[in-house]
């Protein structure tokens, strides 16, 4: 534990270990390495004293006290606020500011527009962490294939795999139904077309990769879902920290015109997610705007990053 904590104050490059000299006086040699598990940074510590060896792995998060509650890029239009929406904290807004709107005869009900400081935003959003962006591009690319020992999906499959061991890859047909499946730890689930997570699925710390991922109503667990087309979280799901949902579409110059009204990432009513939601589309969308949709009584605790549109009817405790 001490070696991992000490490494947080040091620069650790992916694939290169860092020796920690602070432990030499105790006769302990420690080495910390960094790699990515899905989109999450994972650090591994190995400490040796005499003939004893201790290993520890941990996911790493960062707390940024300067991150605003809201950052809306400046596209020469004001932000519109309606209903009972409330912005608490610092907000970066377009030069034209924020104005009260009206939907079906309902205006804005609060006495203040922003409960915090306001600043002018830029035409570009702050970039994702470069390493996270690279991982997302890699894992949503058409040539991506996870590496590891392959296990064929079957009903009642149970896999618990330590991060000290080789990754286990669960695959099967183009469509994977995780009915009554238990997967914990160093496991990747990969499908060519679609993964369906059921309420009977027990998933913890695993990574799901497919063009489309559907999470059934009432699902509980914590995992990463990484897709190139769409993610749907059904009603009443409880996805614990560090859950991560990410969609990145291909960057093509001749994208088809979008005629769908459904969100690219949909969080249905009554669901709670602790972690991060990312939607990245580097190309310009034709037709109807693509968006993240967070329904009424849905709660996100953490960060939402969206470089297109966001329809927020629920609550976000963190940053957008």
Name the predicted role of every residue range.
Residues 10-16, 104:
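Short, glycine/acidic-rich hinge or "gate" loops at secondary-structure transitions
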Residues 33-175, 179-202, 207-209, 218-219, ...:
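Short, ordered "entry" segments at domain starts
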Residues 16-35:
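Short amphipathic beta-strand and strand-loop transition segments with alternating hydrophobic
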Residues 1-12:
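Membrane-proximal N-terminal amphipathic helix
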Residues 221, 227, 231-290:
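Eukaryotic tandem repeat interaction scaffolds
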């Amino acid at each position: 534990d001490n070696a991992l904590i000490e490494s947080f104050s040091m620069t650790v490059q992916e694939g290169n270990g860092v020796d920690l000299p602070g432990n030499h006086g105790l006769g302990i040699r420690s080495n910390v390495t960094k790699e990515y598990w899905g989109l999450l940074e994972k650090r591994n510590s190995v400490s040796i004293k005499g003939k004893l060896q201790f290993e520890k792995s941990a996911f790493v998060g960062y707390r940024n006290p300067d991150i605003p509650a809201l950052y809306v890029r400046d596209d020469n239009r004001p932000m519109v606020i309606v209903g009972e929406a409330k912005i608490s904290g610092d907000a970066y807004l377009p030069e034209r500011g924020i104005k009260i709107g009206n939907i079906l005869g309902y205006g804005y009900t609060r006495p203040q527009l922003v409960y915090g400081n306001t600043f002018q935003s830029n035409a570009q959003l702050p970039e994702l962490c470069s390493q996270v962006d690279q991982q997302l591009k890699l894992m949503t690319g058409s040539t991506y294939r996870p590496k590891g020992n392959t296990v064929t999906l079957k009903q009642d499959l149970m896999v618990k795999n330590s991060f000290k061991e080789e990754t286990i890859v669960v695959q099967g047909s183009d469509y994977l139904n995780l009915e009554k499946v238990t997967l914990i730890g160093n496991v990747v689930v990969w499908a060519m077309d679609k993964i369906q997570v059921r309420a009977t699925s027990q998933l913890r710390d695993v990574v799901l990769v497919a063009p489309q991922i559907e999470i059934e109503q009432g699902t509980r667990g914590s995992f990463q879902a990484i897709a190139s087309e769409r993610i749907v979280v059904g009603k009443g799901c409880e996805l614990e920290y560090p859950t991560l949902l990410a969609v990145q579409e291909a960057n093509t110059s001749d994208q088809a015109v979008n005629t769908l009204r459904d969100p690219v990432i949909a969080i249905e009513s009554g669901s709670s997610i602790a972690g991060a939601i990312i939607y990245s589309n580097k190309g310009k969308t034709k037709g109807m705007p693509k968006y993240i949709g967070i329904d009424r009584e849905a709660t996100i605790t953490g960060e939402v990053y969206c470089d297109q549109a966001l329809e927020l009817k629920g609550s976000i405790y963190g940053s957008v």
